[in-house]
A protein has these predicted regions:
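Beta-strand segments within the central parallel beta-sheet cores of soluble alpha/beta enzyme folds
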Residues: 78-83, 331-335
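N-terminal/domain-start segments enriched in small and hydrophobic, helix-friendly residues
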Residues: 22-31, 198, 297, 301-304, ...
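Glycine-rich phosphate/diphosphate-binding loops that line cofactor/substrate pockets in enzymes
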Residues: 40-50, 138, 303-308
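N-terminal mitochondrial targeting presequence
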Residues: 1-31
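Conserved phosphate- and dinucleotide-binding cores of soluble alpha/beta proteins
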Residues: 20, 29-36, 42, 57-71, ...
Length: 504
């Protein structure tokens, strides 16, 4: 049984009128005694606890607290809730490497193949969940809401109950699923379809913040806020690892991101944070021959207009800003919690551990940027407030179905925020950027796909290294509207796995 007392009980409290006098009243400071050592802060976490771990990749990860958890060899069979699994031996990956995890609930494995291997050997359970849905399930649990309807994932394996959660534990044999996800209830509101998702609840939350006062009011910094804020509101016991502790009164009420009522214990951070991918901008004039990826990104830039709010997915879409004309200024949103992404830093000394994009790359902020937590970020996404989102693809079909996160039987990184990004295509135009054929020469633009879907009838435009197609999402069908320089119609026909009309 897990309990936590968040307030001082006053059995003799009485109602009083709001009145004024010259009487001096001494107020008791709230939250006294919250500051403690890392060892003491995590000492009562039991075997089998549900532990939420904040952070996005390595950004905003409570590194000091995770290090302390590992020092308790008996602390195993943890059900961990973390959007990302860090990297092997770093971030939440440290818990996985040490064999402390029974199950992980999150949206993205990233490059943590160690955990992927454990999953396929049947040693751990993996509950994949779209990133925005994951954030909302945490928020719902914090707010006392047991379930909610979302458009994210409708028509996909999430909706149909086709995700493998655990494999049979056998050595040297092909892995066989022993646990499959449950189908989601669906319902239609207006002219849109939604699925029912249930709230999740944590026993403990291990989070990181920039600053805390002695009462437990917290301030986060830039994209390091991510899942730290909503997880702190959710768990029965929240342990905040902070870079700076200041006296009460040092933080104005308007500056507080997370009120003290949600924070039970405060620990001073002892280990520095890390950047997963240090990326620096190229010097002007450093021209190289355009690759296929560059050709696609350059053409995609022409789809953006001045003043647009856009989300650029991991990989090829991130190249698009480099090819925007000087008279086009767009606001780039990144799902880990920033609107107003700037260029890569020009020097290593300008790299900040708290400022990254969804690909875990170091970035800068525009002067007019705004940072927020994961819940607010996906309010922007799911609510259709973005003008355009650009994503990569494994395959895309003639009716606009997108598959871009999993090839069955192979290592799956997870869907991340992609299912959310394509969940409102009537308000946010979805543009796919992809090479026309895969590494084996097979078409990626196809009539139908057997790959797990990211979204149904969601893609409006397909841009490849050979051509540009418009998609009729309502009736189905492709129209070829443009050929890339030097490409012939015959080549496009030969390398496309779907019928299409021609309107060149």
């Amino acid at each position: 049984m897990f309990t936590a007392v968040r307030a001082t009980l006053r059995p003799n409290a009485v109602a009083c009128k709001r009145c004024f006098s010259s009487l001096s009243v001494q107020l008791k400071q709230a939250g006294g005694g919250k500051i403690m050592t890392p060892k003491a802060a995590i000492a009562d976490i039991p075997v089998g606890a549900k532990v939420m771990v904040g952070g996005f990749g390595l950004c905003g990860v409570p590194r000091t607290l995770l290090d302390e958890v590992v020092k308790r060899p008996e602390l195993k069979d943890l059900d961990v809730y973390s959007n990302n699994l860090g990297t092997p031996g770093r971030g939440v990956g440290l818990l996985a490497r040490e064999g402390r995890v029974r199950s992980i609930t999150g949206s993205f494995l990233g490059g943590n193949r160690e955990f992927g291997d454990q999953f396929f050997r049947g040693e751990v359970q993996l509950n994949l969940c779209p990133q925005g849905t994951f954030a909302e399930r945490i928020r719902a649990g914090a707010a006392g809401i047991p379930a909610f309807y979302t458009p994210t994932g409708y028509g996909t394996a999430v909706h149909k109950g086709e995700l493998v959660l655990k494999y049979e534990k056998k050595e040297g044999e092909e892995a066989k699923p022993v646990l499959i996800s449950k189908p989601r209830e669906s319902r239609r509101f207006g002219n849109r379809d939604f699925i029912l998702e249930e709230a999740i609840y944590g026993d403990y939350a291990l989070i990181h913040a920039r600053k805390a006062d002695e009462a437990g009011n917290l301030i986060f910094h830039s994209t390091a806020r991510n899942f730290n804020d909503p997880m702190a509101r959710n768990a029965r016991v929240t342990i905040a690892e902070v870079e700076e502790i200041v006296p009460v009164g040092s933080i104005s009420s308007d500056e507080v991101h997370l009120p003290s009522i949600f924070v039970d214990r405060i620990v001073k951070a002892e280990l520095p944070l890390e950047v997963e991918k240090v990326c620096l901008s190229k010097p002007e004039g450093d021209a190289t021959e355009l690759t296929k990826r560059d050709i696609i990104a350059k053409r995609a830039a022409a789809e953006l207009s001045d003043g647009m709010y856009v989300n650029l997915g991991v990989g090829m879409p991130n190249l698009v800003p480099s090819y925007l004309s000087k008279d086009v200024d767009v606001y780039v949103h990144t799902e880990n919690g920033l609107l107003g992404v700037g260029p890569y830093p020009s020097r290593e000394e300008d790299v900040h551990t708290d400022i990254i994009n969804a690909g875990k790359e170091s970035i800068t902020e525009r002067p007019d940027a705004a940072a927020f937590d994961a819940v607010a970020s996906f309010d922007i996404v799911r609510g259709g407030h973005l003008d355009v989102t650009m994503l990569g693809a494994l395959q895309v079909t003639a009716n606009g179905d997108l598959a871009n996160y999993m090839i069955p039987g192979k290592f799956a990184t997870g869907m991340g925020g992609a299912m959310d990004l394509v969940s409102n295509p009537d308000n946010t135009r979805v543009i796919v950027l992809t090479e026309h054929v895969d590494k084996t020469g097979k078409p990626k633009v196809v009539q139908n796909t057997e790959l797990p879907l990211t979204g149904v009838r969601c893609v409006s435009t397909i841009i490849t290294d050979l051509a540009v197609f418009n998609v009729d999402r309502e009736k189905g069908g492709l129209t070829l509207v443009e050929l890339q320089p030097g490409v012939t119609l015959e080549e496009v026909k030969a390398k496309t796995g779907a019928d299409f009309k021609v309107a060149l």
